[in-house]
Curated annotation (Swiss-Prot):
Keywords annotated in UniProt: Activator, ATP-binding, Chromosome, DNA damage, DNA recombination, DNA repair, DNA-binding, Helicase, Hydrolase, Lyase, Multifunctional enzyme, Nucleotide-binding, Nucleus, Phosphoprotein, Transcription, Transcription regulation
Protein name: X-ray repair cross-complementing protein 5
Gene: XRCC6
Alphabetical GO biological process terms: cellular response to gamma radiation; DNA recombination; double-strand break repair via nonhomologous end joining; negative regulation of DNA-templated transcription; telomere maintenance
An annotated GO cellular component: Ku70:Ku80 complex
Main location per the UniProt record: nucleus
Keyword NADP part of the UniProt annotation: no
Family listed: Belongs to the ku70 family.
EC number: 3.6.4.-, 4.2.99.-
Active-site residues, as the UniProt record annotates them: R52
UniProt-annotated stretches for the region Disordered: 555-578
CDD domains reported for this sequence: KU70 (cd00788), vWA_ku (cd01458)
Amino acid sequence: MEMWVLGEVGMAVLSAAAMADWVSYYRGDGPDEEEDGEQQEEEGPEAVADYRFSGRDSLIFLVDASKAMFEPYENEEAATPFDMTMQCIRNVYTSKIISSDKDLLSVVFYGMENNKNSADFKHIYVLQELDNPGAKRILELDQYRGDEGRVLFRETFGHNADYSLGEALWACSNLFSDVRVRLSHKRIMLFTNEDNPHANDSAKAKLARTRAGDLRDTGIILDLMHLKKPGGFDISLFYRDIINVAEDEDLGIQPDESGKLEHLMKKVRAKETRKRALSRLNLYLNKDLSFSVGVYNLIQKAYKPYPVKLYRETNEPVKTKTRVFNGKTGSLLLPSDTKRAQTYGNRQIAMEKEETEEVKRFDSPGLFLIGFKPLSMLKQHHHIRPSQFMYPEESLVTGSTTLFNALLMKCLEKEVMALCRYIARRNTPPRIVALIPQEEEVDEQKVQIAPPGFHIIFLPYADDKRNVDFTEKVPANREQVDKMKGIIQKLRFKYRTDSFENPVLQQHFRNLEALALDMLEPEQAEDLTMPKTEEMSRRLGNLVEEFKQLVYPPDYSPEGKAAKRKQAGDAQAEKRPKIEISEDSLRSYVQNGTLGKLTVSALKDTCRHYGLRSGGKKQELIDALTEYFSGR
């Protein structure tokens, strides 16, 4: 099938309508403010990008502490809105300790009798200043949970409805200003079940709107985490003019009020973890038309946090520094004293740093449209590495969202994918990628579960394809196939990625939490990957036995060990493996320095054939063969 060039689909990007993330919050979310620098990406099928960002995240939990927040839900197992809020904040604290302990968190109450803040505003109490999360801070939050916590809170702080939300926002702004370190993101999360706090005081309502506008102008994001209340929570009464709505969100879609911890945590995590672009670049539809996009990881493998080296005498963190010395004289070498070299034809070819950078530079970063193909032409075996996600970046080029939406809608309508040449950043080789369109999805509470945009699927080069020799198997007959179909049908279930947690990671995090909070023993993580054998047996009934009778011989015993079949000529088996490469070809490879073109398997067989050591890395095999043939 011929490739479509930029025709009807491409021209449709000139007219469009507007449009509306979830990311993993483990590892790599909280670097030091000193760690400035460009984002860098590892290449390769198993590579996971490791990026550095300047500044720290900061988050203030602004909690309504009025009496209404302490009234229990009717016919609900959950306690009060305040209890649910404190549990949610505690969960964020523990996750931050694990994933990004350099971030700054704070808890501020309003609507109470007592007050404690730098400006001495009435009925506003700063429980915790902006600081790193830690065990002591979590234990302090735990004091105010449950029935005993509510009693302690009432006795310690009391309640008073004569507060000013504008002054509460002002107090939060002062907390950000008092921080000495550099802040990359500043966010306030407001927890309340009161949808019109200043219904009878227009002056306070006006002050709150003014302060919210000031926060917006200074780059502070205000998010509303509204909680369930009798009669429902109406955002339009007051908070629609107060809260921030991100540029990539639909003004008409707001999440429903939260009456359960699970729903509240889902909203908080979606807001708390900022959308970090792996790169921001242009997508060129042709040489004269382009728009800017951001590239993101929707899913990234979670790792255990890196261990920190400590000095054994004081338990203080230590920093590792690397120095390069001359092997002959022992003198210290500066970066300008070293070069990179490539062995080719038994010669070391040295290159300057500028030359190596020039060799790696193919073109300027960006996505360059090649054409369009039907979605049906993308096959499962084209997968070569994890995909990325593309979303418009309006802040760089005005009008990018409009062009992006037009392209997305037209690709969805025609069921096509866009093929592009993709260079993520300088000094990375180009890749051929497919842009797969995706519609936006929201759940019953109008929380986004799938963002609109394009998945970037990396396609293999011709060099990446392998020819695998498959041994011929005994084909199954129709009766055996039908019986297996029945087994598969009985064991089918709806798969959801968020239903299975990594048991090793979960247990590791629980162990860390137990150590940090001085627990007697860590909570045991449930391994959700273990098959439910009893449920499977109940579903299958006699199908397994019937399948065994169809496939295995009558005297088959699964516990018995299969006897090794002896073949004629085993005693005369060759000790050395046969190799398909002639000695002359090997000499040519050695002389030209091109042994690296051979696979590791071929190199190992060749080494064994000539009685050389066949273990170790590929370079060691190449060195052994080079030394062997150079001496003959």
